[in-house]
Amino acid sequence: MATSRGDDLLPEIVVVTGMSGAGRSTAARALEDLDWFVVDNLPPALLPTMIDLAARTRGAVPQIAAVVDVRSMAFTEDLLSTVEDLRSRGIGARVVFLEASDETLVRRFESVRRPHPLQGDGRLTDGISRERELLRSIRGEADLVVDTSQLNVHQLKAKMVGFFGKARETRLRANVVSFGYKHGLPVDADLVLDCRFLPNPHWVPELRPLTGQDEPVRDYVLAQRGAKEMLDSYTEVLRLLVSGYQREGKHYMTLAVGCTGGKHRSVAMSEQLAARLRDEGVEVNIIHRDLGRE
């Protein structure tokens, strides 16, 4: 929660730092999914300025996560003094330190074929050792130390949700997008449903000017052979997906529902599927991408 202080609302602060390759970016994405305002590679000295700017929004930015990449002793000292100063002002600043074993870090860097940022012309292990020494004092002052050696991406995200999330924030959110195949598939779809096997209301004169949001079109589409069976079958599939996505720490999914033009069948069926997803506890946003695009 943001802290009230005079006329201002001071945000809650989390500083995410630690060893390169230990999962800072993954932790930051998890916080972003929890609606934290995430700032990457922020110099520690600028953190108080960021907090003051957030306070002027009067609560619009209640939580800030600053990802700090400490690559020099000067940055290390800046971070420690900045956190100490914030705490002396009564601002709840917590430091999360991510680490992993040397063996794990070597394996991760080798898998992506990238040098360690402090490696220079030396060996990978030299860079890891140098960084570990630079960060020793920060690790000692951290509020939370997370060893990611045995964690995969999903498990680390789940840990961050456990530390900083609320029950309502862990619900899956779904975009249900109706579209017309003649305009192209949505590029971000996790699952695509094809409604073109259903008779097209376009060929019914009194339905042609209407859309799938209109009751006559909806009733016509749902009355067709196979429509209810399709909805029931995909509801079961979506139930499995929702459970699996939540178990793996996925917070968003995009379900695309297509017909020829994106005006009748896909619109009606996407509305029905969205309602069923809501019944499963999913937060749903409906987008009729090609509606009105003749």
Curated annotation (Swiss-Prot):
Belongs to the RapZ-like family. It comes from the Bacteria. It holds the Pfam family RapZ-like_N. Keywords: ATP-binding, GTP-binding, Nucleotide-binding. ATP binds at G18, M19, S20, G21, A22, G23, R24, S25. Displays ATPase and GTPase activities. GTP binds at D69, V70, R71, S72. This is Nucleotide-binding protein Tfu_2020. The lineage of its organism: Bacteria, Bacillati, Actinomycetota, Actinomycetes, Streptosporangiales. InterPro entries: P-loop_NTPase (IPR027417), RapZ-like (IPR005337), RapZ-like_N (IPR053930), RapZ_C (IPR053931). One of its GO terms (molecular function) is GTP binding. The keyword GTP-binding applies.
